[in-house]
Structure formats: C-alpha cells, structure tokens
Amino acid sequence: CYQLYVGGLQGGHSGGVIHLERGNANVIMTRVYYHLSLNNIEFLLGSFKGGLKDNAIPRECVSVFASNDDFKKIKEVVLKVENDLKEELKESDEHVFVRLEKVDSLNEVISVKESQDIISMMYLMPNGFMHKSLKMDLTNISLNMGVVEMNEKFNIYFSIRSPMESAKDELSNKLSLIASMFKAKYVLDNNYPGWNYDEGSKLRKQYVDFVKETEGITLKEEGTHSGLETGIFKGALQDLDIITLGPDMFDIHTPDERLNINSFYKCYQRLIHFLERL
C-alpha cells in the first residue's frame, strides 16, 4: 500500500487569483494517477482527500492506494510527473512536490475499474481560468475543483464563476456530461447570479465624484472575479444600480489571510459620509 501527498502549493481565492495559474492539488493528484494508468500500473483507491472549500484553490491533497506493482516502477512515474510540474509551474508555484511513501495497510479499497473510471472522469473535467473580458482585462469565466473527498461515496465539489449565466450553464453542462459518461451523479447547488459591469452607473459616478471632492483622491475603478452578495440582489431586482467597495485584504482563503484595519476604518467612514450625502 502506498500514500501519495501533493503539497508546496500557494492556493488562494478561486476567483481573485485563478488567473495566476497556480497549481490545484486535486488536479495534480488526478494527473499522477492517470500517468500511473498510462504506464500500465494498476491501483485500487482507498482514500482521497484534497481541499477544504470549493471556493479556495486546494493547496494539499493526500491519497492512499493499493497496488501489486513494484515500488520502484511507481516511484519513477511519480518523479517524472513531479519534475514536469516543477517546470510547468516554476513561475507560479515553484515549490510544488509530490511525495510517495509506503504505508502498512488499508481498511477498504474500491476495484481497479472503479478507481480508473473515477480518475479518468476527473482527468477530463475542466478546471481553472477559462476566459477573460478583453474590455476590463479581468477573468470572466473560471471553475475550481475545490474539494475532493472519498468516504462512503466519492464526492467532487466545483465552484463555477462568471457574471454571465449562459457561461456558467455551459461549464455546468460539460461537467454534467462528463459525469454521465461514467454513470456518476451530478448535482447543481448553491448557484448565485453574477452581475456585469454597468458603464452607465450613476451611483458609481456619484461615489467617484464624492471621494474626489472630499479627499482629493481619484479612485481607480476595478472589477473583481469573485462571488458577491450584490449579485443576489441584482438577480432579484434587475434595475438596481450597484457598486462595491471594501478594505485592503491579502492572501484571501489561505492561512496567511489578513485585513488592513486602518483601511477598514477609512472605508467605513467614507461609506457613512457618502450615504449621508445621498
């Protein structure tokens, strides 16, 4: 029996940094197993656990499997994949590693066919940055294989992001089709609407003018590829004029996540004064 461990990745917010091409531990683990298959190494999955939240890029993944193949042969495949990854991710996740160790035993495993079907299904599933808005130079469509867990069932959780419902539907349809090819169940849950940039927003102009008048600061307007509650409001009330603002936050959805307290206080005071002006 053997344990595979993928680590050394940065992770991060699956919307805010998805365009940085960081490694996804679940995707990498899947790749390792698929290359074992390509080298005619049979395996029986016993456990698979990667990621904590569907909206965070997974930093780690651990999996245990049984195989009758020689340890040296398996190790050679793992090292080849690891070296390829280090080259491919040297500009975005240079510390990536894949570790193979022997373990004593496994409680339960699934069959070779079931194991290969699961890995093949995951290998086909799209992941990461898909398209960007050329007008705003902002990620427009993405998805993230955030959590994979093997208990009584084998569950895979994705977060799909786009301000356009049609684009989200297309990605959802692809995942559903791939799942059906392997007789897996696909469930769409926690869907929330996005909202597109409104060039004619009067509220945004009022806010920008207010900050310029009161603080002498010219704000830089930016879009964000992340899920916001404002999208839910906009989905229910199509005519709403919406802007978002917030404090400085760093390394969101990682152990290093932090908030600039001074910027929070400044943002809050600015919002209060702006509301008084309206």
What are these regions (language model features)?
Residues 1-160:
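Midchain, well-structured core segments that form catalytic/ion-binding scaffolds
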Residues 10-14, 193, 249-252:
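A short, flexible beta-alpha/helix-coil linker loop
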Residues 22-39, 69-70, 116-122, 129-132, ...:
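His/Asp/Glu-rich mid-to-C-terminal helical/loop segments that flank catalytic regions of hydrolases
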Residues 32-35, 77, 81-84, 174, ...:
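Generic, well-ordered alpha-helical scaffold segments in large soluble proteins
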Residues 46, 99-101, 187, 220-222, ...:
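General small-molecule cofactor/ligand-binding pocket signal
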Residues 54-62, 107-110, 196-209, 232-236:
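Short glycine/threonine-rich loop-to-helix capping motif typified by GTGT followed
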Residues 133, 140-142, 146-155, 159, ...:
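Zn-dependent metallopeptidase/amidohydrolase metal-coordination segment
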Residues 138-226:
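Substrate-recognition/cap regions that form aromatic- and gly/pro-loop-enriched pockets
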